[in-house]
Amino acid sequence: MDKTASLTSQDAEKHDPDALRKERATDPPDLFEHGALDPVYQAKAHLIASAIQEIGMGKYQWGLFVVAGFGWFSDSVWPLMGSLILSPVVNEFQFNSPFLSLALNAGLLAGAIFWAFGCDIWGRRWSFNLSLLIAGAFGLAAGGTQNFVALACLFAVVGFGVGGNMPVDSAVFLDFVPGSYQYLLTILSIWWSIGQLVASLIAWPLIANFSCPIGSTTCTRADNMGWRYLLFTLGGMTLLLWAIRFFVFPLMESPRFLVGRGRDAEAIAVIQRIAQFNGRPSSLTLEELAMVAEKAAPKDAVATQRRQVLSQSSDFSTDHVKGLFATPKLAWSTSLLIALWGIIGLASTLYNSFLPFLLANRGAEFGDSSYFITYRNQVIIAVLGVPGAFLAGWAVEQPYLGRKGTLAISAGLTGVFLFATTTARSSNALLGWNCGYAFHSNIMYGVLYAISPEVFPAKDRGTGNGLTATATRVFGLIAPVIALYANLSTAVPVYVSGALIIASGAMALLLPYEPRGRASL
């Protein structure tokens, strides 16, 4: 009887609005200092963050963890695809190998600009749902190409779709997750590792068994179907992931985006729907939003009116960019992140895009350059990336590490393992060093993908992600140009990549914001 009474009391307290409001006192503090953001937006965003915190991490957020992870999966699979099919495609079409990577990276650049900047203008939902559809459909079509020009053009369109995944999906996930669970954005990189593993596992038997021998003088379509089967398989898989997103998961528009547009009533409706989906009540009301906005608004009526007009505008303007440079601290943070993404983008693309090619080349020196050995090694390397995501999720929450420390250490070790690959005197030694590289680079990327959207205000988050993604894609375009003039059988690309990544680790320590324990607005 006492136990029943106690449960009834607890249940009543759980649904009592006053009790729920008391929970807000334990919310993580805001990441941004007072005055860094528009005062009206900052007040509203804080209230929205508190409402999401009191709803908690429920069914909706865990479902979003899965479907947002599809973006990480796709962003891993398709750039890797350019390198997985490179050797058999070069054998058949006889072209200069870096041109395929160049086409893909051109598409990735266009996609990063279009989708990331667009999601701050027309909202998150369309960008979130369409990017996978484009990647899957054109990836499937690429498998039927008869020449290199058609393949490169279709790969560019695939890149356009894939380019929007990471900037948009990270913004979407962070917009809905409680502040105390923001570390899950780092763990989302597990999907990136799974993507590499799945692509490598499928490529291994297909490329090894249905390809012309390496170095063959004549290679016909009939003898070289492996890379086509691979594109058909992963294109179809990407379309399946899109269908799950579009038809199964009810993605709602971001309440933080809606508040940033002045659409407060719609934001409240979304919060209530999430609470209902999770089986939790929400105490947030439209009157509360209006009250905090009134208190935070400047006394100057003209300034208030101007702010409302700007918040309701749905056209592109420079305000989203200006918001990322509103204070010296924000400007330094944004500039440093853009530089980090550019440097790491150049280094990683230069190395990752040609890794199977490098493995085959170096394997030839060691007498084991077969497709079977090359793609077996690629699978082993991919497996080692999986535990890195979990270690990254743990490390970013440690008091003496946080996001910045974890990023700096993992980047430094990634560069060290890259340098170590140049000392390999056997295929197994080369494989071992590359496993170390894969493990630490997955930690590095997991943190980098998380800290960037965390330190951008939600109303400008898509634009911020777009700037960093554009930087990494622009520098990614430079990588195949370097490869056109570099000797890929030497260690020069490795030295360049390693030095750049180590330098980026040192730069990470200069970031002014540490999101650990703080709520992003």
UniProtKB/Swiss-Prot annotation:
Induction annotation: Expression is induced under iron-depleted conditions.
Keyword Metal-binding: no
SUPFAM superfamilies linked: MFS general substrate transporter (SSF103473)
Lineage of source species: Eukaryota, Fungi, Dikarya, Basidiomycota, Agaricomycotina
Cell compartments where the protein resides: Membrane
GO molecular function term, any single one: transmembrane transporter activity
Chief location category: membrane
InterPro entries: MFS_dom, MFS_sugar_transport-like, MFS_trans_sf
Gene Ontology CC terms, in alphabetical order: membrane
Region entry Disordered, spans: 1-29
Listed transmembrane segments: 62-82, 99-119, 126-146, 148-168, 187-207, 229-249, 330-350, 379-399, 404-424, 431-451, 466-486, 491-511
Disulfide bond positions: none
Source organism: Ceriporiopsis subvermispora (strain B)
Listed name of the protein: MFS siderochrome iron transporter 1
UniProt function note: Major facilitator transporter probably involved in siderophore basidioferrin transmembrane transport.
Bias (Polar residues) ranges: 1-10
Glycosylated sites: 209, 487
CDD domains, per database record: MFS_SV2_like
Bias (Basic and acidic residues) ranges: 11-29
Membrane topology recorded in Swiss-Prot or TrEMBL: Multi-pass membrane protein
Record's keyword annotation contains DNA damage: no
Source organism superkingdom: Eukaryota
Keywords: Glycoprotein, Membrane, Transmembrane, Transmembrane helix, Transport
